[in-house]
Amino acid sequence: MTIHDLAEYEILDEHRVEDVQSDGFILRHKKSGARIAILSNNDDNKVFYIGFRTPPEDETGVPHIIEHTTLCGSKKFPVKDPFIELAKGSLNTFLNAMTYPDKTVYPVASCNDQDFKNLMDVYLDAVFNPNITKYEEIFKQEGWHYELTGKDDELKINGVVYNEMKGVYSSPDEVLSSQIYRSLFPDNTYSKDSGGNPEYIPKLTYEAYLDFYHKYYHPSNSYIYLYGDMDVVERLEWLDKEYLSLYDYKKVNSEINKQPAFDEIKNVEAQYSITMDDSQENKTYLSYNRVVGDSLDEMLYQAFDVLDYALVSSPGAPVKQALIDAGIGDDVYGSYDAGILQPVFSFVAKNANASQADEFESIIENTLKEVVKTGINKEALLAGINSSEFKFREADFGQFPKGLLFGLNCLDSWLFDDMKPFIHLECLGTFAKLRKAVDTDYFEKLIQEYLLDNTHGSSVTVKPKRGLGNEREEALAKELSDYKASLSDEEIKKLIEDTEHLKKYQEEPSSDEDLRKLPMLTRADMKKNAMPFSNIEDELLDVKVVRHDIESNGIDYISFLFDAGDFAQSELGYLGFFTNALGLVSTEKYSYTDLANATNIYTGGISTGTASHPDIKDRNNFVFKFEVKLKVLEKNLDKALELMEQMLLTSDFTDTKRLGELVAQIKARLQANLSSSGHLVAAMRSMSSFSRYALYQDELKGVAFYRSICRIEKELSESPKSVSDKLAAIAKKLFARNRMLISFTGNNEAYGNAKPSLEKVIAGFNKMSAVGNQAEVHFNTAKEAFIDASQIQYVAKTGDFICEGYEYTGALRLLRIILSYDYLWINVRVKGGAYGCMNTFLRSGESYFVSYRDPNLSDTLDVYDRIPEYIKSFSPDERDMTKYIIGTFSALDTPMNPEAKGSRSLSAYLEGITYEQIQKERNEILNAQPEDIRRLADLVEAVLKKDSICVIGNENMIKESAGLFENVEKLI
């Protein structure tokens, strides 16, 4: 039987989607009206999703709350948290759900056929038959609820989505984004935040929430996607029989209307919170925003990505440089959102002065007029096109399956035209047209039409306000106090009973009967053997080469690593700045603008970074490298190496104006990252009180690096030459053959072809640079808190089990899954209301527990301290134990692209990890019994006894717990 024989479906279109090596089908389910798009190919990492068009009508976050709650039990699978049960016990390569401004999507992926079928079944039952209509507690837990534990206690609001969005709205970047869409689309759905504004989330009633679900969650409003190597006919037959045939077509009014264009540009102002003692100077965000056509225009869809690069995102781009030269903003960047009906293009200046708003706008417009008049730099356009095309062809999305990203890309057009799911995947022809257009005035006309003459736009200014977060907290506290005062004794009693009832509901585990309804694999389904490493040593001109014989589709992945272990701790801040500046300053032959363009024209990117590797055999031997990575088509290797050589050996650090621009940009981006990635920052900072690895991470990327950048900024203004000299000295010290190691990922033929080019570039480096002993370090304080203007916390507690005499085993990988998806999930997220909580045990001994967007502080630390007690009483049955093992294997066996396989092999080489070790750990996981986990209780107790904590978050919460900390200071 073929897809053409399925009477239940109408084939609307079928054709070869050559650009993604797939056979494409567009179907309609006749009875229900469900839309189906299929990309059939030989990729065994199969992907499924079902999505719904879900336009919000207000700011209560109802689409977001439904996304959370549909995965809290269903008719066929009534367990309370099937999402977590699947995370524990499936071989998924992706498992999540996402709320967008206009749609909600539920994707899964797996390389295992039976697992893929299981995941599809659970997700489809979740969206069509969720338990949300039976249990209001689900809505309260994930959305919001009043919390009152005693009649004299303070009335509070809690809920996972509520706390998540409090964290989101603590970020000025997010405030700016929401205000941009509100300003541009006042009359359609894009003016409403689908995620929810914490001010309005508590206005959502259970009834309105259910109404939204019943309105939009129907097959007639659905978008179903299948990708990969599967029996498509079998899947479609099953889909019809089990779900779609149960529904008749229903007219669902979910269409998104276009926003009529404005007659004039809108001006909008908003505020974000900073702490009471923060300066308000140069903390304003300025934006220039325009609506650009519609998302069904294939040329515009790609062209404005190219214009983003050519006008503002690339080093020295004209709009960026004009604003920086005028002293407007520390960081200037572009933003292009093509995933909505009417795409939006923005220029943004971060850390500007509010008084510069008019000048900001006039500089942008004058620069654009000049660009239109004189023409855009053709090299910049070609660089932008090549960069986009290289990324598309490589299809490297890190840990995410490429089929998932292809599927999400489909929705950028499919949501607005049932016949056009694949138009943005068939883009190689578009890139060819854009290349031809470089020699015409096509791009200049786009600028004139959409950025200069277009009145459908806005200027949004977001200003800082001291203590705004505290004002909102106080206003909420008063509102809740007044509300409580208005209640009768009976109503207060009811609130207390509701709070107790919800806690009991949360504490009551799913029954064994319900748990057994969830489909599950067996231990026999697990791959017995670990993925091998590929490390083959070679030597070129006395430089060691580690090559990884891996098929890489004609792309060479090369890393040049330089020993940096003798850099003093006081030098690490400068090394961090050097890492960020290299490739963004001029060289002997290239201006920094031309260098960036040439890099993007001839390569898939040249990046710099640092890599820290503990030596598993010798704990005192810490491997610290400066790393330069490049990816390039074999035919362009010589050019790529020439560009890299220019960067490493001839970079000009005497242009202190340029250094000042880079310092300001790094500082601005760090300010955003320290808050948005607060969980990782807190974990590393906490471990930096005892771990060299974590200390280096903090010095090069975390709180210490931010402090160093602030000092370097001051030094540049007072003694610019000293900064230039230090950067030049780093280059001279680092880049020598005796410090060099080369990693090459590609097949044997590719390496053979590359050897002459590699030898040529090696010969250009000095032979020797004095290498000192491993530097001494001074660890940070063990108990710290950092205050920012957010309304939530990131709470970390860390330790080191190797120092306490324990060894790393595969059982620790298993314990991480058990804690993440059981104990921590239930106590920190479900009961505590935090958005997330995670833990890790590294081979080198460092371990952490950390929460994410957490309304609590000391309560979360108490949860961590009770972990050993939980482990001691751990007694799952065989089915549950197998589930944890399967979930652990899911993380172990994530599919990898060629670059990732090479990086994995290189890390093992540098850390002294053998295949025998990882196979032993794999066997320990596969054969683990409950007693193996219980034996880890003492190890975890030793980790927690280190009592190293770090909290980033709300000022009032930190001050209430001030006794926990030896050091409390502002984060930024």
Place the predicted regions along the sequence by residue:
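Non-catalytic, conformational "gating/processing" segments within enzyme and secreted inhibitor domains
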Residues: 158, 210-242, 723-758
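Generic recognition of flexible, low-complexity loop/linker segments
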Residues: 94, 210-214, 273-276, 319, ...
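Long, compositionally biased intrinsically disordered regions
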Residues: 432, 445-533, 671, 680, ...
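A conserved hydrophobic secondary-structure block that centers on an alpha-helix together
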Residues: 72-73, 196, 200-222
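Non-catalytic terminal extensions that flank enzyme cores
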Residues: 1-47
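M16 family metallopeptidases and their MPP-like homologs
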Residues: 45-55, 81-129, 136-147, 174-199, ...
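His/Glu-based metal-binding/catalytic segments typifying zinc-dependent metallopeptidases
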Residues: 40-42, 49-51, 162, 166-171, ...
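Active-site His/Glu-centered metal-binding helix of metallohydrolases
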Residues: 62, 66-70, 578
